Design a protein with these regions (language model features):
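Phosphate/diphosphate ligand-binding glycine-rich loop within oxidoreductases
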Residues: 31, 50-127
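Rossmann-like NAD(P)-binding element
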Residues: 46-53, 182-186
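N-terminal glycine-/charge-rich "phosphate-binding" loop or analogous flexible N-terminal tail
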Residues: 1-49
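Short beta->alpha connector loops
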Residues: 9-12, 34-38, 55-59, 77-80, ...
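Rossmann-like dinucleotide/phosphate-binding beta-alpha-beta segment
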Residues: 128-186
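Short acidic active-site motifs
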Residues: 38-42, 58-62, 83, 179-183
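Structural detector of well-ordered beta-strand residues that form the stable sheet scaffold
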Residues: 4, 72-74, 94-96, 136, ...
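Well-formed, non-transmembrane alpha-helical positions, independent of function
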Residues: 22, 63, 86-87, 169, ...
Length: 186
């Protein structure tokens, strides 16, 4: 069985080494297609792959049509927006993703951007602290929860709106829940 990792923007060496260890210990072959610049390279590489791992690379109907042995496609990340699920289904190819995989990195980036903007690095000497400020979080999923925890650690007042998460759960985590989305943005 051949597992293809195809990424225009490569995974870290540590991630590839981890994938390689798992794949080879299972007795399978790992193939890498990194930094490809032509979709034909992707078509050629996927032709004999049994499994495909991608990041945000587009797995279109055309890619699927070039995959003669493909049984599974794994998107390293949340969502399926880059996978043609209808094409996968038509060929009985399992499509999976890894929700939450990068949640902490995304939450850290959000906090980092808040710090950057609060310090007003565009005009040195005019910045402020985040402590005591209010942050509004639109969606309280994996990333939203982590942003809330990090913001609270910085002394921020955290508000969040998510119609799919019970108000009691958010309040139990010290988050203020506005009645409407409009109130969050007010």
């Amino acid at each position: 069985m051949k597992v293809l990792v195809a990424t225009e923007k490569p995974f870290s060496k540590a991630a590839v080494d981890g994938i390689r260890t798992i794949v080879e210990e299972a007795g399978y072959e790992l193939a890498l297609l990194e930094k490809y610049t032509d979709v034909q390279q992707f078509y050629d590489a996927v032709a004999d792959a049994d499994a495909l791992i991608v990041r945000s690379d587009k797995v279109t109907k055309e890619v699927i049509d070039h995959a003669n042995n493909l049984k599974i496609v794994v998107r390293a990340g949340a969502g399926f927006d880059n996978l043609d699920l209808a094409a996968c289904t038509a060929k009985n190819i399992v499509a999976m993703n890894t929700p939450g995989q990068n949640s902490n990195a995304v939450a850290e980036l959000a906090i980092g951007m808040m710090i950057y903007m609060a310090r007003n690095t565009f005009k040195p000497g005019t910045g402020c602290e985040l402590s005591g400020k209010r942050v509004g979080i639109h969606a309280y999923g994996n990333v939203g929860r982590l942003v809330a925890a990090k913001a609270k650690a910085l002394g921020m007042e955290v508000w969040a709106f998510d119609p799919f998460v019970p108000t009691e759960k958010m309040e139990a985590e010290g988050v203020k829940v506005p009645a409407t989305l409009e109130e969050l943005y007010a």
